[in-house]
């Protein structure tokens, strides 16, 4: 098994990688990041180690080319590097799930994410009656919706079967329904879905289904939909790439993904007051995630937000590749 299957590596590089991996805590970190990006605080809480100790381990893994990092406001997220050697992944991911340390770490990660989902669910339930109005105070909703419809209608997008991931109050689903034959809205919050049901009942067009489910595990069949939309969803998620992976799974080969979300910004109050997990995204982040789960041909459409104090919004569009078949 070659550490570097696509190129010859210098001896010093191989030794650096082997030294970086040959430490239990660093193996635990690499294994945890299989589940998506984490902050230093996340890793400290799960492993039980101090921040200085974890920071030192992270630096070693970065220097070895095994991890990458990016900053969002005051938080720094760590993820597996795209060029991480396949042999390292095979060793780390090959550890038995029943191993005491691996299972304990996984349980703590699940518990932490469950706690956050519960807090977010309470937030969404509380704001559901005024959700659309609240969102319009920080994003240019009218411009976003108009541009979204232009993209869907003007391009060669098949839209017979549409799924709205994180449908919320059903606003976007109600806009897309007249353009489709079948439309499905997915959301994990029961209160939001109740409001969505009221919204879509007033809409003519496709046969509509609303389902309460995790956007990263919808339970929908493989290769079912022509178009998947994730409108202002990803910034609420701990692991946006998991939702994109699910979208790739349920889309037909050649199906279209449309992401509407905030561009990277620095407004920390959205974390503390509005349950945002991420302070927007760069196109480079979206492209990395899309490429990693089987999308191709990413394009971006930036929305004018010059009026007032609205945050910048972008619409990204990508297509599933044959890797998803």
Segments from the language model and where they lie:
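Class I SAM-dependent methyltransferase SAM/SAH-binding core
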Residues: 161-163, 169-217
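A short glycine-rich, Lys/Arg-flanked "PGG" loop and its adjoining helix->strand segment in the class I
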Residues: 241-256
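Conserved alpha-helix/loop element of class I SAM-dependent methyltransferases that forms part
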Residues: 139-160
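C-terminal alpha-helical "lid/dimerization" subdomain adjacent to the S-adenosyl-L-methionine
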Residues: 256-316
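Amphipathic alpha-helical dimerization/coiled-coil segments
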Residues: 2-9, 86-132
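N-terminal helix-turn-helix DNA-binding core of bacterial DNA-binding proteins
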Residues: 9-52, 75-83, 147-149
């Amino acid at each position: 098994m070659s550490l570097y299957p696509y190129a010859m590596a210098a001896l010093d590089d191989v030794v650096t990688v082997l030294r970086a991996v040959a430490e239990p805590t660093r193996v635990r970190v690499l294994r945890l990041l299989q589940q998506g990006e984490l902050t230093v605080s996340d890793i400290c809480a799960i492993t039980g180690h101090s921040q200085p100790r974890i920071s030192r381990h992270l630096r070693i893994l970065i220097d070895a080319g095994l991890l990458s990092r990016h900053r969002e406001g005051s938080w720094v997220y760590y993820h597996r590097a795209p060029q991480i050697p396949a042999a390292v992944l095979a060793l780390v991911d090959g550890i038995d799930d029943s191993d005491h340390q691996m299972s304990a770490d996984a349980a703590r990660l699940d518990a932490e994410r469950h706690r956050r989902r519960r807090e977010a669910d309470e937030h969404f339930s509380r704001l559901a009656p005024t959700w659309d109005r609240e969102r319009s105070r920080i994003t240019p909703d009218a411009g976003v919706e108009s541009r979204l419809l232009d993209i869907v209608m003007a391009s060669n997008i098949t839209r017979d079967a549409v799924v709205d991931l994180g449908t919320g109050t059903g606003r976007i689903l109600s806009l897309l329904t007249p353009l489709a034959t079948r439309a499905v809205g997915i959301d994990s919050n029961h209160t939001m879905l109740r409001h969505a049901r009221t919204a879509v009942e007033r809409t003519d067009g496709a046969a509509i289904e609303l389902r309460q489910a995790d956007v990263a595990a919808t339970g929908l069949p493989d290769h079912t939909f022509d178009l998947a939309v994730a409108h202002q969803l990803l910034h609420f998620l701990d692991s946006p790439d998991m939702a994109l992976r699910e979208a790739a799974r349920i889309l037909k080969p050649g199906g279209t993904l449309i992401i509407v979300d905030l561009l990277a910004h620095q407004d920390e109050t959205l974390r503390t007051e509005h349950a945002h997990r991420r302070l927007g995204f760069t196109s480079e982040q979206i492209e990395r995630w899309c490429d990693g789960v089987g999308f191709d041909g990413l394009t971006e459409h930036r929305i004018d937000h010059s009026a007032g104090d609205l945050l910048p919004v972008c619409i990204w569009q990508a297509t599933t590749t044959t890797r998803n078949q």
